[in-house]
Amino acid sequence: MVTKTLSVLFVASEVEGLIKSGGLADVAKALPKALQTLEQDVRVTIPAYRNIPNIDSAEVILSTELDHWPHTAYQVKKLSVEGVQIFAIECAKYFDRPEMYAENNQAYADNGERFSFFSTACLDMLPKLAFQPDIIHANDWHTGFVPFLLKSRYQQHDFFENTRSVISIHNAVFKGVFAYDELQCLSEMHSYNVPEASVSDTHVTMLKAGVMCADKINAVSPTYAEELKTELGSHGMAAEFQHRSADLFGILNGCDYGAWNPETDAFLPRKFKATKHSMTRGKSACKQKLQQDVGLPVTDCAVYGMVCRLTNQKGVHYLLPIIEQFLKNELQIVIVGTGDPVLASQLKELSALHSDKFSFVEAYNNELAHLVEAGSDFFLMPSEFEPCGLNQIYSMAYGTLPIVRSVGGLKDSVNDYDQEPEIATGFAFEEPTPQALLAVLHRSLLLYAQNPSEIKRVQLYAMQQDFSWEDAAEEYLAMYHSAF
């Protein structure tokens, strides 16, 4: 165990408990909290978006401006999430908007400028607040310029002389590609062509800037770290990840068992623990409540749940062609999610045709998400790619067996029943096709129908797995120390 206390600034575009659009927010809450439990000195900084609760009345701890960002004042407001201090950077010009990144599925045209400003302000505020971090931990493209600016501008100052940077890659699809002329306030981008960030003579990518300039890089699972070194897995940045291979770590995300625990979950009609009797009765009560809430007949058939963004990344396009064939069996499917309107329309049509077996809820509701995790027998994650994934970990905690494609963090966290029955925690397939998904669905259903006691054994084993953030935080600490 690494014992030396480090000061860490965790820089993210969102954090669960204040504002969230995806899994990054979960990590931005849970990892700093776990690091703090390990007696590290941690702060989190995010933009002060309009929709953060009570942001207007939050304490202002700094009012200043960026000297080289003309006429742009900003404030830092102090918030807290479960004991972790949050620095929220407020600048109405950039963050007083209805949404975080986009409106009506259209990204804000000045996102490059917005998050360049945020990255710069993150560094500018630190001497003024007298918080001197050993590690600045950036996340994804939004904060990719933090390691770049630290290296190119700020590290020449005594205050930052011993500060090191890390960047986490949660999803390399989104790179933050912008034209040089969209970033006019970053003089470094105009005094010379920046090889660390450039993708052409006219454009830079913020993610590449972070990857090439950070002292250490981590992917959110060991398999994803390997996938990033391929063109397919990195979505066009294989050369950069290969170049930085010696500094690339793969650390599997943890699970926030405070929020996802069937023994304490307030959303469940009956709580349960990892014993055969408790799990059987608890999951039965949760299944009945789930069926009632989504309008399906209350029966003891196998229930397959799915909670996701409706995108091809999540494998919805593998599921759609084979749903009707699979529904010919004695089972039910519940899908909860929002996203691509074309996929949503197709799911609505299918649920209308098979209303006794298939329910599609076009919404995200936290209570319903918990009920799907607890009341389903199987949880669908047939992802095209999945850097880490969290729902498969939540599912196991609730004795719901994940059915996954063997990629990224899904491969690292789920043991396939056919490959390793004694230590199985779910079912997996590899081929990215609807037919491969259908085959694994039939495998799971066959075991459910023919060997109920074996299903219960696997469910109980899955419930006993531990993906704690404390273990992950120990790995992050080791990576931080390796940066010096």
Swiss-Prot record:
GO MF annotation: an example: alpha-1,4-glucan glucosyltransferase (UDP-glucose donor) activity
Similarity comment: Belongs to the glycosyltransferase 1 family. Bacterial/plant glycogen synthase subfamily.
Organism, scientific name: Vibrio atlanticus (strain LGP32) (Vibrio splendidus (strain Mel32))
HAMAP family: Glycogen_synth
Role, per record: Synthesizes alpha-1,4-glucan chains using ADP-glucose.
Catalysed reactions listed for this entry: [(1->4)-alpha-D-glucosyl](n) + ADP-alpha-D-glucose = [(1->4)-alpha-D-glucosyl](n+1) + ADP + H(+)
Keywords from the UniProt entry: Glycogen biosynthesis, Glycosyltransferase, Transferase
Protein name: Glycogen synthase
